Amino acid sequence: YQSKPLSPMWRKVNSWGQFLQFITILPFATIASLTDLAGPIITSKEFGSITEGFKQLAATIKNRQEAAQFARDIGIVTNETVANAWVTEAEQDYMDPKVRKMSDAYFRVIGLNFFTNFTREFAAGMGVQFITKHARNEFNNPRSERYLRELGLTREDVLTWIQNGRRMTTPEGQKVKQGLQRFVESSILRPNAAERPVWASDPHWALVWQLKQYFYSYQKVILGGVKREALTRLMESPNTPIRATVGIFALTAVATMPLAMLGLELREYAKNGLAWLLPGVESGPKYFRSDRMDWPEYVTEIYDRSGFHGAMAIPMMAGQAADFGKSPVFTLLGPTAETVDEAFSNGWRVDRTLKDRLLPIYNQL
């Protein structure tokens, strides 16, 4: 695709098509991203990190300026508009400049930029707690040395860094900085070309690939990290495989699923509130869908929203579309193709297409 640059016309089509899907599909993206807070807890690899996560979350909120400055100091947050789990910097670079500004503004308005930076600041704080805890190793954790080694650190590096006032300018400080960067990159989704198929980097396919990046990145970064840790523990304790691996799997579930539950609840309250606020729709019990679910259905819903299917979520969504009488092909071809398909299916019922697909917020209610 580098030998065949994107034509100006196709660039505009891609840009406006993507922007339309941003404003119609992602108004609740910040709420849906709450599960991102589980990443640093999972990467901390021990059940005690759940308690530490609550403490660090409170500390990040309370000392926001300090947390933000530390994140900038180690290079995981910049003052520029950030990419998020739903759209990468590379995808933004191929957008029409006017549409990109509008997209950036939209993500600021819905709070996604703020939340993306906040999760990175939280992850940086969790990283400091992680390396400090395992450098001191007060409870003689046999895995502590390995945990630090995986970040390119030793116990001596971290303790010397602490004794020197946690300055990043010392040789140990530079190693700690790189180690914390590795921790954050293993905790927070920051999609890039390495986390998607080769064809997905071609801007000609932007409308087909749109909104699929999250599932690939979650599988590679979070689920891949869990898998690697489980395999390592299996090699360390081959005679007790269940005991060796159950902890990391349980931690992943316990850290993620309550956040998915909270996200679903907040989404339903947000929809109900908007229905009360906006003309033409009424608030009511219909927006609290989870209240009508039985336990198996609710657990399945939360499992889906936790992201545990990874990239398999894409063909599964296509299968669900087929169950509802829609074409799974258009689901695989992306939300823009689904919009076109729905418009043709509705024909002259333009009002239905507007309400169900094209009117931001209303199409979610």
Where are these regions (language model features)?
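Non-transmembrane, interaction-prone alpha-helical and coil segments associated with secretion
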Residues: 1-201, 234-240
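Small-residue-rich, membrane-active alpha-helical segments
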Residues: 30-70, 74, 78, 82-90, ...
